[in-house]
Amino acid sequence: MTALAASGLRARMESLDLLANNVANASTGGYKADREFYGLYASAEASANDYPGTMPVIERPWTDHAQGMLQSTGNPLDVALDGKGFFAINGPNGPLYTRNGNFRLASDGRLTTPDGYAVRSTQGSPLVLDGTRNIQISSDGTVTQEGTIIGQLELADFTSTDGLVKQGATYFRIADPKLRPTMATGATIAQGQLEGSNTGSAEAAVRLVSVLRQFEMLQKAVTIGGEMNKRAVEEVAKV
């Protein structure tokens, strides 16, 4: 019983890490919540002896890619995706993908993320704009300035998001070498809007409190189990 409670305690500790990160990013644009999935683990020794006991563990944390609410900002450099897909970014070590369209202009005119990574055009190159001229971004990502087409935002989609892993709070990179990006055809772009986090602060806080209570109960169970084991050993020693 003590081992079972200890295993549950470890699983809840992992959950607390995930949930604390969700709470911290509840107001981060384009953030996708981390979720926990509890599985049951049986050791090789237990399986070999047909021992029925199993241990709860977080089998595999997963990312919830559900779309967040779109929020109007009025900033022409802010863009939100409505539908499936990602903005393609030139990261420091290769392509990255994000739902956070909080873009800005670098001193050289490149359209970048807040971290300074260039936003990719459909040609794979950065988009370079004139900060003194009006910027229009259409629903298909075409960028124009005073009637002149500058380029088009590259929108990527994937047959499965299982092969994507988080890099930082709002970026994703391809971890599965077999996974290839395709053109996102089911999404439209809304200029002057941003997609909010898909985890609300209230929801994340409630879940955090719930898991914290479970953690405290399991912690007590481990302590009580340890004391019972100690007393049992002492009683055996008296025999």
Identify the meaning behind each predicted range:
Residues 1-239:
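Amphipathic alpha-helical polymerization modules
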